[in-house]
């Protein structure tokens, strides 16, 4: 609605009511997206814990042999432990009371590391997605997790998780989705297992929130048949019918796309 962003000048026909309406639209959109991301996050966490713990034991996340890049593994492990030490969950506090010690450098650490099903409960979506991406590509469990989430290839899931993690960070910082170009976007997928888009999107379309939102819808369809993500979005668009959703990438005839029917 601005004609000059640098000088904060608005177009002549701009109305305060429209600004307020779009603000509330964006706020409600973020809540719906956050709820869907939580579903994806819980599934990713559960699948990682199950598949990898079954094969390699509860402390698999500490084994550098399971990861493609040892330096990244060291960094991600540090982040994982830091998140665990910061958590205020009761079960974490109980674990810390028994195992928290001070190392030779004076830093707090654990004398006994928790199994994956404990420490991963408080891991952030970003940390989970980075740990998954860095798993050795040859591990059958990496592919199994991708398959469980509806995708054929683990690199497709890694790319999607990275884009969704970026979306989550935008929402967590209360930043707008409206009229935004996404720095991270989902990679293209081949031979989708479920209903998807009928054609590849243009370069411009791929930068819009629509592409990430559609990837999220695909994952929700794969992991939870009873989800209401699409219904909530459609209801929001109907409630705010005067808000032009092309600004978030919903192009003409988007409802005719197989996944959105």
For each of these PLM feature ranges, what is it?
Residues 1-261:
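Long, contiguous internal "core" modules enriched in hydrophobic/ aromatic residues
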């Amino acid at each position: 609605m601005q004609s000059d962003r640098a000088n904060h000048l608005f177009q002549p026909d701009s109305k305060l009511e429209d600004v307020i309406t779009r603000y509330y639209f964006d706020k409600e959109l973020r809540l719906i997206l956050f709820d869907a991301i939580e579903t994806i996050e819980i599934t990713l966490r559960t699948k990682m814990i199950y598949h990898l713990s079954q094969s390699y034991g509860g402390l698999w996340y500490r084994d550098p042999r399971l990861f493609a890049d040892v330096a990244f593994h060291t960094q991600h492990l540090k982040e994982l432990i830091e998140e665990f030490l910061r958590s205020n969950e009761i079960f974490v506090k109980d674990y810390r009371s028994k195992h928290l010690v001070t190392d030779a450098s004076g830093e707090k650490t654990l004398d006994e590391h928790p199994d994956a099903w404990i420490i991963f409960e408080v891991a952030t979506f970003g940390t989970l997605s980075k740990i998954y991406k860095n798993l050795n590509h040859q591990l059958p469990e990496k592919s199994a997790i991708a398959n469980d989430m509806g995708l054929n290839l683990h690199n497709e899931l890694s790319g999607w998780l990275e884009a969704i993690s970026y979306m989550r960070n935008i929402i967590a910082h209360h930043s707008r989705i409206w009229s935004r170009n996404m720095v991270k976007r989902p990679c293209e997928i081949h031979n989708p297992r479920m209903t998807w888009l009928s054609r590849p999107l243009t370069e411009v379309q791929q930068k819009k929130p629509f592409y990430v939102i559609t990837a999220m819808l695909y994952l929700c369809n794969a992991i939870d048949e009873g989800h209401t993500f699409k219904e909530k979005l459609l209801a929001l668009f109907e409630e705010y019918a005067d808000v032009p959703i092309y600004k978030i990438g919903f192009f003409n005839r988007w409802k005719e796309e197989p996944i959105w029917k």
